[in-house]
């Protein structure tokens, strides 16, 4: 068997059998509208505060826009911006000033949307892929139905809400965590939200992230875990919001969907404390976390192949966390 394994570029991570049932821990109280902390491996909400309450997602809605655009569009295409889109962006939003009549790659617009939260880039991507913002929104709501989300609805691609006259964009912390979990299983989206800076391939734009963790403007315990990305936002109705994804060094990932703090500083500080609390309780044996390869969470493309590995608590992966099964290894050999 050693000969068969020689030269295979796999990282085999073996984990002990999980405990029977999930241990419960008390949810810390936070000054916010709602939050949910989810185990990304299993999709289970570990603890939260008013996690099913109606909230306004603000620009975290762009995660769903990104999902439907990546799944529908040609990610290697070039999109020419239109004046009636970039100069008439959805009200109550921030624009980067990408200009009209400029050719950007699909990936350029995606990065500007997710990293800097640019409404002009988001609307341009939506129109470039679907032909209209309305068609994009229809796809977003269809995706909500597909994912079984009953408390989430969108009426624009960028996350404008009741404060700007968009009354049909709303969600819950739990369901936005589910949307983030799905988005973070798509390699292109995962890559975009993990960057602090980005230079567009076309158009000459330089993009900075709004994620203070990635910019080094918000402290967290890097010896225990690493913040690997996701999306921020703010509106008057939503308050300051952020959905963060963190990974420890054993293959576990947590998602914290946090909505409605009074300031950006306190939002990031609260999320850090919730990640600290969750990972520390895991170390103490009070929480069970589920390791997994991120690209199979919301996909059935590997079918029984992945099940053969996960049944034995063996997770073959490349260094970036993608599932990389070795077909030469049988269940018996594992």
At which residue positions do the language-model features occur?
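Sec-dependent N-terminal signal peptides of Gram-positive bacterial secreted proteins and lipoproteins
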Residues: 3-22
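Short, mixed-charge aromatic SLiMs
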Residues: 86-98, 200-206, 299, 328-330
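Active-site-adjacent loops and short helices of periplasmic peptidoglycan-processing enzymes
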Residues: 21-174, 183-184, 324
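Penicillin-recognizing serine hydrolase domain
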Residues: 27-32, 131-291
